[in-house]
C-alpha cells in the first residue's frame, strides 16, 4: 500500500501541510519505505506520498490481515490521508478473492468513498473504546494525591456515550477474575483487555478475543 496525503472522500484531492504527529507501525512482517518524519512538510510541489507499506505472511489472507493491522497502527496528524480508504479496500470480499480489474474503485465505490460510513458493529466497538479510555482518565483524576479526608473522589461506572444525536447508555466494570473490563451497551456485552497508557496516541486492545487498533485524539471530554 502507498500511504498518500490526500482526501479519499473528495476524489483523492491532495492534502498539503505539516505532519504534526507521525508514528509508523512496526512488526516482524512489516516493511516501510518512507522519506518523512514528524514535522515534515507535505508540499504542493511534490508527490504527496508519505510512505510505502509492505507486509508478508504464509498466505495471501494472512498477509492482507497483517496489512490491515499495520494500517491501523499508523498515527498521522496534520494532513488527511488515504489510510482508511486502503483499509476499506483490503476488507472487500472482491479484493480477498483476487477477482478484480482496473475498474475496481469505480465498481466498488460508484458514488465515491464515504469516510464517515462506519458499520453498526464497528460503532459499538468505538463506543466500548471511548468508554474504556474515558474511564482511565477518570480513574487517574480520582487518584490525585493529597485529597481532603472524607472528600475522596470515586468514579461511577454508568454513563452516556454521545454519538451525534444518539445517546447510548453504557456500563463498565473491572473483572477481577480475568483482569478484563466488561462493557455493557445496547443489551450487549463486550470484554476488553488492554495495557494502554494515558497520553499514548495509539490504542490497542483485545475486544471479544479480537485485536483492535485505534488512534486516540482527546479534545476535552470528546474523543475522535
Q: Model regions: which residues?
A:
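A conserved acidic, glycine/proline-rich C-terminal tail/linker
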Residues: 188-212
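Short aromatic-centered micro-motifs
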Residues: 161, 183-185, 205, 216, ...
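Structural motif
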Residues: 175-177, 199, 219
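Structured, non-catalytic alpha/beta "coupling" segments that mediate domain-domain communication
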Residues: 10, 207-224
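Short solvent-exposed loop/turn micro-motifs enriched in small/polar/acidic residues
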Residues: 152-154, 165, 196-198, 207-209, ...
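Catalytic cores of soluble metabolic enzymes centered on carboxylation/carboxyl-transfer
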Residues: 2-191
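Short, acidic/polar N-cap/turn motifs at the starts of alpha helices
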Residues: 156-158, 180, 200-204, 213, ...
Amino acid at each position: 500500500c502507498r500511504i498518500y496525503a490526500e482526501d479519499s472522500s473528495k476524489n483523492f484531492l491532495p492534502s498539503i501541510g505539516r505532519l504534526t504527529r507521525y508514528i509508523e507501525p512496526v512488526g516482524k512482517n512489516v516493511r516501510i519505505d518512507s522519506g518523512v518524519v514528524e514535522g515534515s512538510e507535505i508540499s504542493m510541489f511534490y508527490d504527496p506520498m508519505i510512505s510505502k507499506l509492505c507486509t508478508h505472511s504464509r498466505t495471501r489472507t494472512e498477509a492482507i490481515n497483517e496489512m490491515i493491522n499495520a494500517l491501523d497502527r499508523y498515527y498521522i496528524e496534520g494532513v488527511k490521508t488515504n489510510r482508511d480508504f486502503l483499509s476499506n479496500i483490503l476488507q472487500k470480499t472482491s479484493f480477498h478473492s483476487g477477482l478484480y480489474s482496473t475498474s475496481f474503485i469505480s465498481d466498488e465505490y460508484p458514488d465515491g468513498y464515504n469516510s464517515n460510513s462506519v458499520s453498526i458493529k464497528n460503532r459499538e466497538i468505538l463506543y466500548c473504546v471511548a468508554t474504556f479510555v474515558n474511564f482511565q482518565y477518570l480513574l487517574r483524576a480520582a487518584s490525585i494525591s493529597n485529597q481532603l479526608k472524607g472528600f475522596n473522589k470515586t468514579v461511577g461506572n454508568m454513563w452516556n456515550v454521545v454519538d451525534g444525536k444518539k445517546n447510548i447508555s453504557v456500563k463498565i466494570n473491572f473483572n477481577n477474575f480475568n483482569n478484563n473490563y466488561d462493557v455493557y451497551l445496547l443489551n450487549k456485552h463486550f470484554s476488553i483487555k488492554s495495557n494502554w497508557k494515558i497520553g499514548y496516541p495509539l490504542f490497542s486492545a483485545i475486544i471479544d478475543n479480537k485485536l483492535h487498533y485505534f488512534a486516540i485524539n482527546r479534545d476535552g471530554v470528546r474523543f475522535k
